[in-house]
Every structure is written in structure tokens, then in C-alpha cells.
Amino acid sequence: MSKQNKKDWKKFRDEHKEEHKVENEILEEETDEESQHQEPALGHPSYTALEEQLTLAEQKAHENWEKSVRALAELENVRRRMEREVANAHKYGVEKLISALLPVVDSLEQALQLADKNSDPSMHEGLELTMKLFLDALQKFDVEQIDPLGQTFDPQQHEAMSMQPAPGAPPNSVITVFQKGYKLSDRVIRPARVIVSTK
């Protein structure tokens, strides 16, 4: 090899050495950056700790979700219960007042039965009119009279005072009404007191 060729070769080799050195430095820097950004290996302690934290966070999130669902359900139940109580208060709010007025109605009925039409017809007429006004006023508040004479005995609406044989009457029917009953809407506030026929 000639001297010129040796010089050229040496020059070429030195230039490439410098290039390789720069390339290697760049590669090392890139490798360092990549290794810093890589996730830890599956068995690495920090990876296991992160997995445990994630599992705990998921469990806590699920517990909180269940609590919120239960709280919403409870809130809905409270809302419905309050609506029902308000509706019942509107519907049955006058029950105590009606119960207090029922003895007055009973007294008017007894007075009508005892009053002799022949002795004082105007008094009898006045009692009838008062009784009608009273019953009309009760109807405005959805109060209904229970007068079960001749009907089959119903323990939901009638109170049997006694039972006795009654020829010609079907068994288990009301043959005498001692005291009429009353209902407020669909609720019995006083059952009718009756005598029931036997077989």
C-alpha cells in the first residue's frame, strides 16, 4: 500500500471513528431516556405496589357506588312515604272531628224515633231537617253511613252484639241495627253494632 493510500485510509478511519463515537453517544442517550420512561417489569416491587393501590381504589369505588345506590333508594322510599302520609293526612285529617260528632248524629236519630208525629209535627219535621243537613255535611267530607239491616254480616264493617234465630231471615244476616256505623273514604271509623241471625 502506498503512503498516500495509507494516509487516506487513516484519515477515513479517523473520520468514521468520530462518527461512530457521536452515534454511540446519541444511542446511549436515547437508551437512557427510554429506560427512564419504561414501565417497571411485572415482578418489580413498584409495579406490585401500584397493582395493590389500583385494586384498593377499585374496591373503594365499588363500595361508594353501592352506598350511593342505597342512599338513592332510601331517599326514594322516604319521598314515597311522605307523599303517602300527606295524602292520608288530607284524606283522614277530619277523622277525630267526625268521630266526635257521631254521638250527636246518634242522639238526633234517637230523638226522631222517640218523637211522636201526632203530638208536635213541626218538632218532628225540624229534627228530620237537622238530621238531613248533618248527614249532607258529613257526605261533603266523604263520610258514608253504614246501615246494614237485611245485609249479610261483614266483620270488617259490622260488630255483632249477639246472635239469635230469626225465622224467615237468611242465616248470618243482620236482623237488628243497634247503632249505625260510619266510613271515612274507605276506612271504617265506627262499625255498625248489630244482631245477626243464626240458622
Curated annotation (Swiss-Prot):
Recorded name of the encoding gene: grpE
Presence of the UniProt keyword Cytoplasm in the record: yes
Organism: Legionella pneumophila (strain Lens)
Protein family: Belongs to the GrpE family.
Annotated GO CC locations: cytosol
Protein name: Protein GrpE
Function field: Participates actively in the response to hyperosmotic and heat shock by preventing the aggregation of stress-denatured proteins, in association with DnaK and GrpE. It is the nucleotide exchange factor for DnaK and may function as a thermosensor. Unfolded proteins bind initially to DnaJ; upon interaction with the DnaJ-bound protein, DnaK hydrolyzes its bound ATP, resulting in the formation of a stable complex. GrpE releases ADP from DnaK; ATP binding to DnaK triggers the release of the substrate protein, thus completing the reaction cycle.
Protein's cellular compartments: Cytoplasm
InterPro entries (alphabetical): GrpE (IPR000740), GrpE_coiled_coil (IPR013805), GrpE_head (IPR009012)
